[in-house]
C-alpha cells in the first residue's frame, strides 16, 4: 500500500511519547512492505535537522517548521471560531502545500492521521480511505 502518514510531532528521534508511537507504527508499516510518506511538523531548525533520520524508516518525508510564537498566534486567532483552537496551533501553510502536492501527484491507498489536531490537512479528501488515530484523546483535553 502507498500510505500517507500525518502526525503532529516529527517522529524522529523516538525519544518522547508523542514520537515513539508514530515512529514504531511507521517503522512497522515500512518493514511490512508498505510505501510510507511521513508528513509532520518540526518546532525548530535543530529538530528538523535531527528528524532527517526518519528517512531510514520511510520512503520519504515532508515537514513544516513552526515556531511557538506563531503557533500561539494562530491558536488565539481561532478562539472566536467554532473550530478547536488547537487546529490553529498545529497548522502550517508550508506543510499544507506539501500535503496538497503529494495528494495531487500520486495515488494513495490510505491516509493515516495520528492525532486529531492534524486531521485538518486532509479533511477535504474524500477519495482515499482514512484512519484517524485519536492518540491525543484524553479527558484532560476534551
Region locations from a protein language model:
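Redox-cofactor binding/interface segments in oxidoreductases and associated redox assembly factors
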Residues: 5, 113, 132
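Short, solvent-exposed loop/turn segments at secondary-structure junctions
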Residues: 10-11, 43-45, 68-69, 116-119, ...
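Conserved nucleotide-sugar donor-binding subdomain of glycosyltransferases
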Residues: 67, 72-125
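Active-site proximal beta-strand in glycosyltransferases
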Residues: 126-142
Amino acid at each position: 500500500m502507498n500510505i500517507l502518514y500525518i502526525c503532529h510531532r516529527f517522529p524522529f528521534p523516538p525519544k518522547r511519547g508523542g514520537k515513539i508511537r508514530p515512529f514504531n507504527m511507521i517503522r512497522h508499516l515500512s518493514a511490512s512492505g508498505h510505501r510510507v510518506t511521513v508528513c509532520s511538523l518540526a518546532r525548530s531548525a535543530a529538530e528538523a535537522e535531527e528528524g532527517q533520520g526518519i528517512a531510514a524508516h520511510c520512503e520519504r518525508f515532508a515537514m513544516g517548521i513552526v515556531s511557538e510564537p506563531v503557533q500561539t498566534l494562530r491558536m488565539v486567532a481561532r478562539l472566536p471560531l467554532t473550530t478547536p483552537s488547537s487546529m490553529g496551533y498545529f497548522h502550517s501553510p508550508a506543510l499544507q502545500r506539501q500535503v496538497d502536492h503529494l495528494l495531487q501527484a500520486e495515488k494513495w491507498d490510505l491516509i493515516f492521521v495520528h492525532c486529531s489536531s492534524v486531521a485538518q490537512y486532509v479533511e477535504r479528501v474524500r477519495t482515499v480511505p482514512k484512519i484517524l488515530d485519536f492518540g491525543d484523546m484524553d479527558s484532560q483535553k476534551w
